[in-house]
């Protein structure tokens, strides 16, 4: 039964992938000639995300109201599926690691939907913030994952604060989203994309699941006007932690060291 389920879902995913490539190629010349607006194309991308989740047998339940609006959107980060889940609910541009651009097919589609690619360790913060602000000025939502990497979901990792400058400089709202992959007990044993796992290995496990339900919790936007980025990042993290009803854990060693460095600088 598991083999049959995987095969059927893989076939459906392949069909949706080919459909995505066809749509992107057909719309490319129309977008260049401005016969199709970027907002319309982003709405199509959101529709495609929903089709892909359906092909994989994944259901999304939303708590709160997700209102498409220009701003910096943030979320906890557990899996590569996070992008499909959030993208299925609203047109949004993502900030993603540069490795995604090299993924077959997925990298092409991500580039077509205006993904901002971040190369780790390349000191690109200023360029990334500028690219995010350009999209904000054009009226788009831009989402990044402040944890900087995926985690198992036991707790929300420390947020990196630098990209919050994109919102602070333009007084753009911060829209907090919280993701939970339902399983009893938590966290989900299969979904987290961690421990140097390959994408194919993780996908293979996800496709074998009889059913996967994801809860996406939307919280009211936070004001970035006049905020200090580190304090804003900590406030955002706390909102997401409370939404997921996670305990405030003892700080992981890396965070303890970061706190000590901050005290020494002070």
Describe each PLM feature range:
Residues 7, 12, 45-98, 110:
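Conserved H-X4-D acyltransferase segment
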Residues 97, 118, 145, 177-179:
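Generic beta-sheet signal
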Residues 135-164:
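Catalytic-site beta-strand/loop segments enriched in glycine and acidic/polar residues
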Residues 105-108, 154-235, 249-263:
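A cross-family acyltransferase "interaction/gating" segment
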Residues 70-72, 139-145, 173:
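Residue-level preference for the first positions of well-ordered beta-strands
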Residues 1-61, 108-112, 209:
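A transmembrane-helix-recognition feature enriched in membrane-embedded lipid enzymes
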Residues 78-136, 140:
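Membrane-embedded segments
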Residues 117-120, 219-225, 237-242:
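Polar-ligand-bearing catalytic/cofactor-coordination segments
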